Amino acid sequence: MKVLITGAAGFIGSHACEHFIDSGYQVAGLDNFDDFYSRSIKENNLKTVKESDRFVFHEGDIRDESLLKKIFDNNSFDLVIHLAAKAGVRPSIYNVKEYYDVNVNGTLNILEAMRVHNVKKLIFASSS
């Protein structure tokens, strides 16, 4: 079984990667290292999973349709766990367009890639 986990370098995403690797899945992680909190923290979150031969990491943005096409074209995912999003209620008030672009349009890109590649299972967690 193969799973794509977006937001893989975040706290929840990195733990999801660990769980699915430990459960025998092949895991592809995707994250853009958004600066909501330190990149070094996120890199540390991925330290353990990057040691696994069942893990492949892609650095990039869910708004990048060509990147998503490449990732989906090169894999046959059974499941997508979509955790990537701009988080934080207060900052969203001052940057509505970017939050909308990432959280709505980025999610639509994931859904479209899933549709095109016939991936039927999605676990989606909303940002705060």
Roles of regions detected by a PLM:
Residues 1-128:
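N-terminal Rossmann-like NAD(P)+-binding domain of SDR-like oxidoreductases, especially those catalyzing
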